Amino acid sequence: HAENCSGELLRAVHDFAEKHDLGYTIHTNQSTWEVDYMVKWHGLRPIEYFAKHDFLGPRFIAAHCRYVNAAEIALLGRSKSIVSHQPGMAGNRGANPPIPELRDAGATIAMGTDNNTNDVFTVLRVGLITERMRRNDATPGLLPQPEDIFEDCTLGGATAVRQATSIGSLEVGKKADLIVVDTLKAHLVP
């Protein structure tokens, strides 16, 4: 959590990850209390604080991001950071991150569980439904498509763990575990 990290710690983690070709993650912007605390004590919102300490980038996995503002969304996108979206937890807390805006800004979206459910199909379904609700499109149900959420779960996840060149999509030379899903079963219809 941002409120528990000094700038020195953030830089040390970043430098260690760079040196050893690793990714790193932190839970952030998951409550208004956290954002208010950071503004009160550091004069910056969490993502701005991370940017100040060179913590953002393609190795950085930001879990949650439910309360990011437009400036933070832009920082995450420009830095090619990864947002790990936990739809089950977001639904449980009643606050969904602005996934469409994050995606449009250039952030990679990955899916996570964070303890509410470990059933990947539930994560996918809740992610699809909550993103559609947040979009509030005039023509409901067009975006995202199930394929978009599936890509967040597969290629987004592979990108998050720095393995997108070897897993995450069906391509010649990549490793893959395959399953067959009967989408005609009522509980699996997107």
PLM regions: where:
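Histidine/acidic residue-rich metal-binding segments in metalloenzymes
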Residues: 1-82, 93-109, 165
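Residue-level marker of alpha-helix boundaries and capping positions
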Residues: 3-4, 63, 89-90, 144-145, ...
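Nucleotide-sugar donor-binding loop of glycosyltransferases
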Residues: 28, 87, 182-184
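Short, acidic/turn-prone active-site loops that include or flank metal/cofactor-
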Residues: 30, 87-92, 114-116
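His/Asp/Glu-enriched, well-ordered alpha-helical/loop segment
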Residues: 52-59, 100-185
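A short, polar/charged loop-to-alpha-helix boundary motif
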Residues: 187-190
